[in-house]
């Protein structure tokens, strides 16, 4: 019997391998990879409200992670591994789901930048960012979770392929991205399938850029099939590869004049590549124009500043470039995703070796076609080199010259070997074409020398129009207000857009488009009474305005007016953009009425009609389970999990249906907001028992729970307890114990922004008006929606009860300052904050700013900062203190302050180098004003001397001293001394 079973298993396995073309199935597994990793301190305890943003990066409700160090230690990272006979790839699910490396097993070369240490700098939206591998940027660049754990899973398929899945739902907009990385048996290509999806109730801005770091050397060549490039903001068209200055930027060693950051322009070609003569290896990226039409190259450059970035981001002084692919023309361009809209696209990554360059590429093969001059200038040798991504055993190569076929070569192509063919003694004045076909005669790849899908040069707009300048507010048209508001929304400036729409309605009080836009944005900002007023006025004039009806329905839901909400959704569900989310909302209302069968029918039909809106099917699993149709639910769940195996809600539903998932609970425990995300989906359908079930669970702790720095455990997260108590009350149970527990929990790093939290926190305050935590968190929630007055009212109540709540007085002080209030009043709040929350550096920075606004002396400003008791002041405090001391004439003290702690580099921000040079020039200016010009000139003369205690090198000092700002200051000093 054993022999029969063994034979049966052998037949099955050999049959499976035969279906894979004789190749073994792809392996996928999880283990750990230990790397030297630079330590990160606790995150900033202050909520980064939009009102306080100065750099255009909106992060609330996330913490800021700028507390970086110069100390490294070995760190074991969870690693997801994917391997076939040609490639072995590693993904870090705890670092934004980045692909860390992909090794070409044929030559041991890394396709991407496998930085041997993880060294963080302040580059990402929240701060911490490290250079390596592939980063997934959605809905913003270097997004909020780029250095944090995300959802992940692995899967295998019957064709022998295997996949790694990574995904995330962000907390700022509630938008979701998902990436599936797949290897097929016997193929040397990594497939990347991406889905972008808006499961939230309101529209939000987005873009997508795949960002792949590739290690480079001076002889590395960049193959971007384009004749022109354009700079950020769609400005400054230049030529490629040789720019207008005569520099060939396709050679990395030529990047000597600062960073190179260019987007392809006027090209329809779908590929790009990097090749290293240093290693005879490289990588090619392919995405059709219908998927990702835009390409970008970024390099820090090889000048002094670029070399500093190498030091800041690596321990081995390695250089890398970023090859990027995106949806829009540049990284200043955003679009909108409406509720339940999704986008899908596919990219391919191909390793190349022993091919010398890239002429053309697609997912099947990469071609390098080159001419070798001969002694006779009228003759040439044509060399063809091909890397096949998969096997073509009966391929044929055809060489043509435009008049006919010159030669053919029957060849068996395989990823295991590079194909080369030389065609000698050809006329040099001819143009040659190479075509590769398979055994059926279908074209695998074809190229004609010099022919690319470019916009004809004569049609290329090289002088770009200036950006539209909006007229003064009193001269703006209705369209000006609408487009400016939309532009501000696309840039994340929601409060500015709100002000723009309101200003537009002052000028055009009867404008339906402005009223609709304002009402929609008010819903997004949780300003519900105002939204109901504005959207109702639109419906009064246009009864079938579907957008206004949909958002009015959301507003009525938030106000608890369910019948009004249903009537609004019955209009918006009729057809068009808002039909899918309206069907979802109507199903939720059906369930709240107890009509689960009607809700199921509605969701099932909606899921069939809109398969790209996956949330429509997710809740249907719950309805089937609660209706007793467990087997149907399990069958449907299996289908959904096949397409989205990392979905935490689906994983939880599987567990509710009895399927074992040992890692689910640790995954949920790693971020309490994952638990709330699931609970709120149940609550939205009125399924409070289901919500309570996940909220009351005892979650694990310890090494199995992998969280980002500062993340509280669920059992210490007050919002979990508040939601628990709220659900109990709606179930006619006693929620007092939960509310009481929440009131005693620490609120550090707890920043509410979900609209559902209004009812939850108000219920807690109804139960206990003296709950300081609930007042403080409700104030944060109001502030997140731009409602400063309501926020201050709640914060004042919290202050009277417990002024030591983290960030409370900081929030109040900055709100007074940003409302152009009394700087003296702000200073009082900050002084109180230094006593109640003494380790919070922003209380001291806020006090310094209030004193500055009040016109107090630099010495007083410096004294405020010097009271900070912490051992590791943030860079902002160090730099501001140094500037204030310099302004007070205490230059030696200012320079000493710069040496007090390690300051990580910040892209686009102030650097230690910049502040040092500014201080020295301020000192020279002071000397000149005292007629001590010889001393001033001597100081300027020695400005570029190395400063070992600050790790400032001469080349960097020379470069900074030649900046426009420094030159202007030096010129002013010299002019002063010349008088």
What are these regions (language model features)?
Residues 31-41, 47, 78-82, 98-101, ...:
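A contiguous, surface-exposed recognition patch within enzymatic or periplasmic domains that forms
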Residues 48-75, 79-83, 131-188, 305-335, ...:
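Extended, loop-rich substrate-binding clefts of extracytoplasmic carbohydrate-active enzymes
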Residues 69-71, 83, 90-108, 166-217, ...:
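Acidic, contiguous internal or C-terminal segments within carbohydrate-active enzymes
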Residues 358-476, 645-660, 726, 730-754:
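Long, contiguous interaction/recruitment modules in multidomain scaffold/adaptor proteins
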Residues 497, 531, 565, 599, ...:
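Single-residue signature of alpha-solenoid repeat helices
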Residues 507-508, 540-542, 575, 609, ...:
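Structural marker of alpha-solenoid helical repeat scaffolds
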């Amino acid at each position: 019997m054993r022999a029969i079973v063994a034979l049966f298993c052998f037949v099955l396995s050999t049959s499976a391998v035969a279906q894979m073309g004789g190749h073994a199935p792809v392996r996928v597994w999880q283990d750990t990879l230990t790397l030297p990793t630079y330590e990160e301190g606790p995150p900033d305890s202050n909520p980064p409200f939009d009102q306080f943003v100065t750099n255009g990066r909106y992060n609330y409700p996330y913490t800021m992670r700028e507390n970086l160090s110069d100390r490294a230690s070995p760190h074991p990272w969870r690693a997801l591994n994917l391997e076939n006979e040609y490639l072995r790839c590693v993904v870090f699910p705890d670092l934004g789901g980045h692909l860390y490396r992909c090794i070409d097993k044929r030559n041991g070369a890394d396709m991407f930048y496998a930085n041997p240490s993880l060294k963080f700098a302040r580059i990402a939206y929240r701060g911490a960012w490290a250079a390596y591998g592939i980063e997934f940027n959605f809905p913003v660049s270097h997004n909020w979770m780029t250095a944090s754990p995300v959802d992940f899973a692995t899967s295998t398929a019957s064709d022998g392929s295997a996949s790694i899945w990574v995904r995330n739902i962000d907390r700022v907009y509630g938008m979701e991205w998902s990436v599936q990385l797949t290897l097929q048996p016997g193929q040397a290509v990594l497939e990347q399938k991406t889905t972008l999806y808006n499961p939230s109730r309101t529209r939000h801005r987005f873009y997508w850029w795949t960002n792949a770091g590739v290690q480079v050397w001076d002889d590395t060549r960049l193959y971007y099939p384009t004749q022109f490039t354009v700079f950020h903001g769609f400005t400054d068209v230049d030529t490629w590869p040789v720019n207008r200055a005569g520099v060939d930027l396709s050679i990395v060693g030529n990047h000597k004049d600062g960073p190179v950051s260019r987007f392809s322009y006027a090209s329809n070609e779908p590929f790009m590549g990097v090749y290293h003569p240093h290693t005879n290896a490289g990588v090619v990226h392919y995405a059709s124009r219908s998927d990702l039409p835009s390409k970008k190259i970024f390099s820090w450059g090889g000048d002094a500043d670029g070399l500093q970035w190498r030091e800041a981001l690596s321990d081995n002084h390695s250089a890398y470039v970023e090859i990027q692919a995106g949806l829009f023309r540049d990284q200043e361009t955003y679009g909108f995703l409406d509720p339940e809209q999704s986008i899908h696209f596919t990219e391919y990554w191909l390793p190349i070796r022993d091919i010398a360059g890239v002429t053309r590429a697609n997912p099947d093969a990469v071609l390098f076609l080159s001419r070798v001059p001969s002694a006779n200038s009228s003759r040439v040798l044509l060399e063809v080199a091909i890397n096949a991504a998969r096997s073509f055993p009966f391929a044929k190569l055809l060489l043509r010259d435009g008049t006919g076929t010159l030669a053919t070569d029957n060849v068996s192509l395989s990823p295991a070997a590079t194909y080369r063919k030389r065609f000698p003694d050809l006329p040099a004045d001819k143009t040659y074409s190479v075509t590769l076909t398979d055994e059926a005669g279908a074209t695998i790849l074809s190229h004609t020398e010099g022919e690319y899908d470019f916009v004809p040069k004569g049609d290329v707009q090289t002088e770009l129009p200036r950006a539209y300048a909006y007229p003064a507010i009193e001269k703006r048209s209705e369209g000006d207000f609408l487009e400016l508001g939309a532009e501000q929304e696309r840039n994340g400036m929601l409060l500015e857009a709100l002000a723009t729409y309101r200003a537009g309605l002052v000028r055009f009080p009867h404008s339906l488009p402005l009223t609709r836009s304002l009402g929609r944005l008010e819903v997004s900002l949780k300003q519900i009474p105002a939204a109901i007023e504005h959207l109702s006025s639109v419906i009064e004039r246009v009864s079938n305005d579907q957008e206004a009806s949909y958002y009015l329905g959301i507003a009525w839901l938030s106000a608890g007016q369910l019948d009004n909400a249903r009537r609004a959704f019955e209009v918006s569900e009729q057809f068009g953009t808002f039909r899918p989310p309206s069907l979802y909302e109507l199903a939720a209302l059906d369930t709240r009425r107890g009509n689960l069968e009607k809700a199921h029918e509605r969701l099932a039909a909606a899921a069939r009609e809109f398969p790209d809106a996956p949330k429509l099917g997710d809740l249907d699993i719950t309805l089937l389970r609660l209706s007793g149709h467990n087997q149907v639910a399990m069958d449907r769940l299996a289908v959904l999990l096949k397409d989205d195996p990392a979905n935490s809600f689906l994983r939880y539903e599987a567990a509710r249906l009895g399927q074992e998932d040992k890692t689910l609970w640790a995954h949920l425990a790693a971020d309490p907001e994952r638990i709330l995300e699931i609970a709120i989906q149940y609550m939205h359908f009125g399924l409070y028992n289901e919500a309570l079930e996940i909220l009351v669970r005892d979650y694990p702790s310890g090494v199995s729970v992998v969280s980002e720095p500062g993340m509280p455990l669920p059992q210490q997260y007050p919002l979990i307890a508040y939601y628990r108590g709220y659900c109990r009350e709606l179930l006619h149970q006693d929620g007092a114990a939960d509310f009481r527990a929440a009131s005693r929990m620490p609120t550090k790093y707890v920043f509410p922004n979900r609209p559902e939290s209004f009812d939850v926190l108000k219920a807690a305050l109804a139960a206990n008006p003296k709950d300081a935590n609930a007042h403080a968190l409700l104030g944060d929630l109001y502030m997140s929606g731009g409602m400063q007055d309501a926020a201050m009212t709640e914060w004042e109540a919290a202050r009277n009860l417990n002024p030591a709540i983290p960030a409370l007085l900081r929030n109040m002080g900055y709100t007074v300052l940003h409302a152009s209030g009394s700087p003296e009043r702000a200073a009082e709040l900050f002084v109180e904050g230094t006593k109640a929350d003494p380790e919070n550096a922003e209380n001291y920075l806020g006090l310094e700013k209030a004193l500055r606004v009040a016109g107090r002396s630099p010495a007083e400003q410096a004294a405020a900062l010097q009271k900070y008791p912490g051992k590791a002041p943030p860079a902002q405090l160090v730099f501001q203190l140094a500037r204030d001391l310099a302004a007070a004439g205490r230059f030696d003290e200012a320079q000493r302050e710069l040496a007090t702690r390690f300051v990580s580099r910040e892209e686009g921000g102030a650097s230690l180098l910049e502040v040092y040079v500014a201080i020295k020039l301020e000192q020279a200016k002071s000397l000149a004003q005292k007629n001590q010009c010889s001393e001033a000139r001597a100081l300027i003369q020695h400005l570029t001397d190395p400063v070992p205690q600050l790790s400032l090198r001469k080349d960097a000092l020379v470069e900074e001293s030649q900046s426009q700002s420094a030159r202007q200051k030096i010129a002013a000093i010299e002019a002063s001394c010349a008088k």
